[in-house]
Amino acid sequence: MAFRINHIHLKAPDPRKTAEWYVGAFNFKIVGDETRVFGDRFIRCMSEDGALAVNISGARKNETLGPGDAAAHHGLEHFGFDSENLEVDIARLEKLGARLLEGPIQNPNGPRIAFLKAPDDVRVELVERKKAISGGCC
């Protein structure tokens, strides 16, 4: 069996508010909203293309959550989104409350990237790939 990523799970003090931010920022769809047996509010989201599930929940009963960390760090450090225009998307996300942390950065022979702080101290990356030149090479 080939492994594939099943979902990403974010923890948030206000799961609905966080889910609605991702709806506005990246066209996620909210496909479920419930209080689980664990006592946490649990919001199920899907990416616009339906390829990635993102779950957003609060603390479970008797669970104390530490702070988020949008700085570079060990462990799961960020998740990335494709961008057709970094500057346009950075400005749009900043209007939604995100904060630019790094970039835009041009990787030699690679994409342009930028890192932003999203709600709940989640680090997200925007990736703008080089555009193909029409008519072929040279």
Report each predicted region and the residues it spans:
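N-terminal beta-strand motif that seeds the catalytic metal site of vicinal oxygen chelate
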Residues: M1-A19, L76-F81, V127-C138
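Core segments of cupin and vicinal oxygen chelate
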Residues: A2, H9-V54, K95
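Exposed loop/turn and edge beta-strand positions of beta-sandwich/beta-sheet ligand-binding modules
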Residues: R4, G39, G75, G110
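Short amphipathic alpha-helices within nucleic acid-binding modules
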Residues: W21, E87-R92
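A short, acidic/glycine-rich surface segment
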Residues: G39-R41, K61-P67, E102, I133-G136
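Short, charged/polar surface micro-motifs in flexible loops or helix N-caps
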Residues: D49-A53, R60-N62, L86
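A short acidic-to-branched-hydrophobic micro-motif
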Residues: A53-I56, L126
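Vicinal oxygen chelate
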Residues: F81, I90-C138
